[in-house]
Amino acid sequence: MSHGPLRVGIGGPVGAGKTTLTEKLCAALAHRCSMAVITNDIYTREDAEALMRAQVLPAERIRGVETGGCPHTAIREDASINLAAVADLRRTFPDLDLILIESGGDNLAATFSPELADLTIYVIDTAAGQDIPRKRGPGLARSDLLVVNKIDLAPHVGVNLARLEADTQAARGQRPYVMARMRAGVGVEAIVAFLEREGGLLLLPQD
């Protein structure tokens, strides 16, 4: 019996690189499994439109949800708008293996309802400062995978990368993390391996 597609929540502050991560995962996986994306924006469908422009997935496999108000409510306390989008995608594409659910930009406290996401990936931005891992919000400390993005910017913003990674390790304990440069595709392979290992995602072999 099928349990339906693996649902992966992608969260993190505005500008951390969530949409870039979503785009890179689509580019890496769209030819290896049946997948779709749901994006959450407060008043627009900007992220969904950005993915459509990038042409990483057919437009009909991308749903843009306008959350209004606080974006974290739509992924946690009242996930009904996202659950409806999941149900719609499953009706349209019964063979789905993977749905990526990108939250609207939010703070370190954002978490996904377990009803909505099987796994959660949280993205932080190296340029946001040295102390981000030490703030240890639930998204950063308890997500299934943490992505520390834009590590190439560290020398330009006065961040000591070795210390940032040590603080990240301390905040995460045994939970995995990836040091990444999403725009250049650095870290994408490790994230794909995580989805296979922890989510049981079955992929066709690479061409």
From Swiss-Prot:
Subcellular location, record wording: Cytoplasm
Membrane-crossing residue ranges in chain numbering: none
Superkingdom of the source species: Bacteria
Keyword field: Chaperone, Cytoplasm, GTP-binding, Nickel insertion, Nucleotide-binding
A single GO cellular-component term on record: cytoplasm
Residues holding GTP: 12-19
GO biological process terms held by the UniProt record: urea catabolic process
Cystines in this chain: none
Main location: cytoplasm
GO MF terms held by the record: GTP binding; GTPase activity; nickel cation binding
Chain's role: Facilitates the functional incorporation of the urease nickel metallocenter. This process requires GTP hydrolysis, probably effectuated by UreG.
HAMAP family: UreG
Family statement drawn from the similarity comment of this UniProt entry: Belongs to the SIMIBI class G3E GTPase family. UreG subfamily.
Record's subunit section: Homodimer. UreD, UreF and UreG form a complex that acts as a GTP-hydrolysis-dependent molecular chaperone, activating the urease apoprotein by helping to assemble the nickel containing metallocenter of UreC. The UreE protein probably delivers the nickel.
Protein name: Urease accessory protein UreG
Protein species of origin: Cereibacter sphaeroides (strain KD131 / KCTC 12085)
